[in-house]
Regions:
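M14 metallocarboxypeptidase catalytic domain recognition
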Residues: 2-5, 13, 21, 34-598
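Sec-dependent signal peptide recognition
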Residues: 19-25
Length: 598
């Protein structure tokens, strides 16, 4: 059955004045179930001006594959009480724009008169209760899996929900149903996502969302950073930002999530976070951030084009409609720098270090949903949780509706990516594209909508800063074990050289290169910038006990991001590789004798 996409694409949304126009391709995009059918080319188009009265696109009409309630559901016997809220950081008129929802969500951390959110012990008990409830019923199976420990020894756990024969990863894979991975609170001061996932865990296990499990499997990690959550602080115990550690995998928390992804192979990954109200907006633009949610799917170089189309038409558009139906507002993920002279507002960038982009490079539909609330304490907490529950319920419903297509999509993408080895070009460094945008804020005094025109760095059509011929694979020195271990955590196939060999390859040499404007943003995000390099064609000596990483595998694009030295956040830039002599590009299929690492 071919996959049908509408002619309009997401880049026609919400922009005020286009800077560049690119040609559109055919109005229909077809992908046959047979993987021999080539994916049609797709050239993104920078947005055209649109009327401000039609901010949200109409969702693509889809015949539901299963009839379930996918709007937020009220928990049993809710108690209509007002939670303890923090002092207002803005005027009462602005606060009035964020009324509590009609539904009252009930988790341990959302009870009346609480000053803290769900504790680690309460979270464990809540998840355990969902497993216990399902043990008394037939059909749905549940398990609470230990997936690791935080830097301070707190348990990291995942709740698995399925109608398969078991809850281990092999059983989920044999169901033929797509698996959705939901995780939250990788920054400890972003609690709404965690509380929302507890609500969804109960509704999937015992409530009105349980019928979705006829079509999908769900894995939930409600809290990835329990150490930060215990302090109400963003960073992990060692001071790392877990949100920027999904390529390097330096923290045990990010490693635990990577192992879970490697084993359960989710087709859809959702990161539920919160965005922080920034003082830069009132100072530079005279307005307060207004949106209940910011959302962005993977926007990084070398993504399969079909993932971008699926993220837009199968997920983002229905999600917009769901939030709008609940009276909630949403915008692309964006931020402004604290530099008073810099009036640019930027979408999240193409760097592969966050989960949104890293999981996209693993051929999953990867989405980041951030509610309005980091740093707000308990202020508007019911609305923030309502935003998360509404948005993620839409993602679950979209996955159930597209379950058959998504199950066909994974083998197609894996074959396509693996088949690109030794062919064409690969983008090493990309940047957002400058544009103009009408951004809505709130008047800080009256709370009324306020629209301003801003310089806008768009991630919807990336600029290629540097690219080179795609190699057949990469050679790594025998001293590159730390990098090899991280690649294998991701699920990358790595071969060990058994007999000394000579390989035709490109060697890296340091070479000056003009600085790019994005380097300042990389520094603000804590992303290591790679060195400036030039390529020298030559012979690579591959001794025994060195390594070969072929690109003829499904995770080839993740390998490129990790091993091209000048890619942002690369393993050389982040010092998992010691120097340029530890890595080389192999430019012809090697005949070297190797064995796959166990």
């Amino acid at each position: 059955m071919p996959y049908l996409f509408s002619k309009s694409v997401h880049h026609a949304l919400l922009f005020r004045r286009p800077v560049v126009r690119l040609a559109m391709t055919a109005p229909l995009f077809l992908l046959a179930a047979c993987t021999s059918v080539p994916l049609p080319p797709w050239v993104p188009e920078l947005p055209r001006p649109v009327s401000r009265t039609n901010t949200f696109p109409t969702p693509v009409p889809v015949e539901p594959a299963v009839v379930v309630q996918t709007m937020p559901v009220a928990p049993p016997a809710p108690v209509a009480v007002s939670p303890v809220e923090d002092p207002l950081p803005y005027s009462p008129a602005v606060a009035a724009r964020f009324p509590a929802p009609t539904v009252v969500y009930s988790t341990p951390g959302l009870q009346a008169n609480r000053t803290n959110f769900t504790t680690q012990d309460e979270l464990h008990a809540w998840l355990r209760d969902q497993v216990a409830a399902l043990s008394r019923s037939a059909g749905v199976k549940a398990a609470l899996l230990p997936i690791g420990a935080s830097q301070q020894g707190r348990a990291l756990e995942a709740l698995v929900l399925t109608r398969g024969s078991g809850t281990d990863h092999a059983s989920l894979l044999t169901t033929g149903r797509p698996t959705v991975l939901l995780f939250a609170q990788q920054r400890g001061d972003e609690p709404a996502g965690s509380e929302g996932l507890l609500v969804l865990a109960r509704e999937l296990a015992q409530g009105l969302l349980q019928p979705l499990l006829e079509r999908i499997n769900v894995v939930i990690v409600p809290r990835l950073n329990p150490d930060g959550a215990s302090r109400g602080e963003a960073l992990a115990a060692g001071g790392q930002d877990i949100a920027q550690d999904h390529l390097r995998l330096d923290t045990p928390e990010a490693q635990a999530l990577a192992r879970l992804v490697r084993d359960y192979q989710p087709m859809v990954v959702v990161s539920a976070g919160e965005y922080r109200l920034s003082g830069a907006y009132p100072q530079k633009f005279g307005g307060v951030q207004k949106f209940d949610a910011l959302m962005q799917y993977a926007t990084t170089p070398n993504l399969p084009e079909f993932l971008t189309r699926a993220g837009e038409e199968w997920y983002r558009r229905p999600l917009l409609a769901s939030l709008k139906g609940q009276g909630l507002s949403i915008e692309w993920s964006h931020s402004a720098s604290s530099d008073a002279s810099d009036r640019t507002v930027s979408m999240e960038g193409p760097e592969p270090v966050n989960s949104r982009n890293a999981e996209g490079l693993k051929n999953a539909v990867s989405v980041a949903i951030d509610s309005r609330g980091a740093g707000l304490g308990r202020l508007h907490i019911q609305r923030r949780v309502h935003t998360q529950v509404t948005a993620i319920t839409s993602v679950l419903g979209s996955t159930a509706q597209r379950a058959r297509e998504l199950s066909q999509l994974r083998p197609y993408l894996e074959k396509e990516v693996a088949g690109l080895a030794c062919k064409g070009q690969v983008v090493v460094l990309a940047a957002n594209t400058p544009a103009q945008y009408d951004l809505q804020l709130l008047d800080p005094t009256t709370g009324a909508d306020k629209t301003i025109a801003v310089d806008w760095d768009s991630a919807l059509a990336l600029r290629t800063v540097s690219s080179r011929i795609r190699p057949c694979g990469y050679w790594l020195s025998g001293s590159s074990t730390p990098a090899v271990e991280r690649l294998r955590l991701h699920g990358v196939k790595v071969l060990e050289v058994i007999e000394p060999s000579a390989l035709l390859g490109d060697l890296y040499r340091e070479a000056p290169r003009p600085a790019i404007a994005q380097s300042g943003r990389l520094a603000r995000q804590g992303v290591a910038a790679g060195p400036d390099v030039a390529l020298v064609r030559g012979v690579v000596d591959a001794p025994a006990k060195s390594f070969y990483v072929p690109l003829s595998q499904p995770l080839a694009n993740l390998v490129v991001a990790a091993l091209e030295p000048d890619a942002p956040g690369s393993y050389l830039a982040s010092r998992l590789l010691k120097g340029l002599g530890d890595v080389a590009r192999v430019m012809a299929e090697p005949t070297v004798k190797t064995q796959e690492l166990p």
